Amino acid sequence: MKTFSATPADIDKKWILIDAEGVVLGRLASIVATRLRGKHKPSFTPHMDCGDNVVIINADKVQLTGKKREESHYWHTGHPGGIKSRTKAQILEGKHPERIVTLAVKRMLPGNRLSRQIMTNLRVYAGSEHPHEAQSPEVLDVTSMNSKNTRSA
C-alpha cells in the first residue's frame, strides 16, 4: 500500500470556534496550532495546508499561570537604541489584547513559509462577537478536554 499524500482537492477545511475565556494560554495555543496544522487528521500531509480555519473569541480573558503576566515581551524597531518592551499584562489591558494569543500560536508553529500561510487561517477576537456566523463554525470546548486547561482568576 502506498503512502497517502494529500492534494488540494483532497483537503476539506472546517471552521472551528473556540472560547478562550478562563483557558490557560499555552494549552490553548498548543491545541490551536495542532488544529491549524491539521495534525489531528489522519490525512495529514506535512507540506500541505490541510488544517482547519480557527476562530478564537474572548482572547482578552485568557489566563496566564504563575508570574507570566509580569514577564516582558521585547522587540527591536530596527533603529539604534530601538529596543522596546511591554509586559503581557500591559498588552492584555491595552488596545490589542488578541495579539498575545496570536503570538503564542505563531511561536508553536514551525518558522517557515507554510506556517505563514497557515496563520492566515487563524482569526482572533478580543470580545465575544465575530463576523464568521455565515461559516457556521463548530464549537470546540477546550475547557472540557483536560482539567488543567482552565484556571480561575
UniProtKB/Swiss-Prot annotation:
Protein name as annotated: Large ribosomal subunit protein uL13
UniProt cross-references to SUPFAM superfamilies, sorted A to Z: Ribosomal protein L13 (SSF52161)
Keywords, comma-separated and alphabetical: Ribonucleoprotein, Ribosomal protein
Molecular function terms, GO-annotated: mRNA binding; structural constituent of ribosome
GO annotation terms (biological process): negative regulation of translation; translation
Role description: This protein is one of the early assembly proteins of the 50S ribosomal subunit, although it is not seen to bind rRNA by itself. It is important during the early stages of 50S assembly.
Annotated organism of origin: Roseobacter denitrificans (strain ATCC 33942 / OCh 114) (Erythrobacter sp. (strain OCh 114))
Subunit and interaction comment: Part of the 50S ribosomal subunit.
Superkingdom of the organism of origin: Bacteria
GO annotation, cellular component aspect: cytosolic large ribosomal subunit
Polar residues compositional bias, start-end: 143-153
Family under the similarity heading: Belongs to the universal ribosomal protein uL13 family.
HAMAP family per UniProt: Ribosomal_uL13
PROSITE patterns recorded: RIBOSOMAL_L13 (PS00783)
Region (Disordered): 128-153
Pfam families associated with the record: Ribosomal_L13
InterPro entries, sorted: Ribosomal_uL13 (IPR005822), Ribosomal_uL13_bac-type (IPR005823), Ribosomal_uL13_CS (IPR023563), Ribosomal_uL13_sf (IPR036899)
